[in-house]
Regions:
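N-terminal nicking endonuclease/strand-transfer module with a His-rich metal-binding environment
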Residues: 1-182
Length: 182
């Protein structure tokens, strides 16, 4: 439960969202989304540990405005979630590239069923995102090295505690010193 609250606090950070100007929600209030999500989870037919899902939608640097990015994020969430799942959408403007975070409840508001996260649902999200970007004259960002990273891995890397990131940094620093594979 506290992990959900931490994720929501992170994506709603006023320093990243222009004092929460770029924070919106559907089917819940962003101020109490963790509590509202938990209420839905308590009513779910299927139980499980997954409280919510977290999507990150990235845009090429300098290609869009925060307002347009936020609107495209809303369109993506509305199309993918079809009005069934409450969500919080934020647009982060503090880095060199604008990006959206969409955290949505793992249980729908209509039949209290869990969201099915699999290769097909991921492909549907990608297709919808790519179409929306093209319709708005934006580049389609290809998945990079971060593809497939779990939230725990992403969070550890963000905090500087990722053993994978540390190992990669060490390897990157010694590769130029090598003259062969031996």
């Amino acid at each position: 439960k506290s992990t959900l609250k931490k994720a929501l606090d992170y994506i709603e950070n006023p320093d990243k969202t222009d004092e929460k100007l770029f924070v919106s929600s559907y089917g819940c209030s962003y101020e109490t989304a963790d509590i509202e999500f938990q209420m839905l989870l308590d009513q779910a037919y299927q139980k499980g540990n997954n409280l919510a899902h977290h999507l990150i939608q990235a845009f090429e640097p300098g290609e869009t405005t925060a307002e347009q990015a936020h609107e495209i994020g809303r369109q993506l969430a509305d199309e993918v979630l079809q009005g069934k799942y409450p969500y919080v959408l934020t647009t982060h403007i503090d880095k060199g590239h604008l990006h959206n975070h969409i955290v949505f409840c793992a249980v729908d508001m209509v039949n209290q069923r869990k969201y099915v996260s699999n290769k097909q649902s991921y492909a549907f999200i990608r297709r919808t995102n790519d179409r929306l970007c093209k319709e708005n004259g934006l580049s389609v960002v290809k998945p990079g090295r971060d593809k497939g990273k779990t939230y725990a891995e992403w969070d550890a890397q963000r905090k500087g505690t990722s053993w994978k990131a540390k190992l990669k940094a060490v390897m990157d620093s010694i590769i130029p010193l090598s003259s062969d594979f031996d």
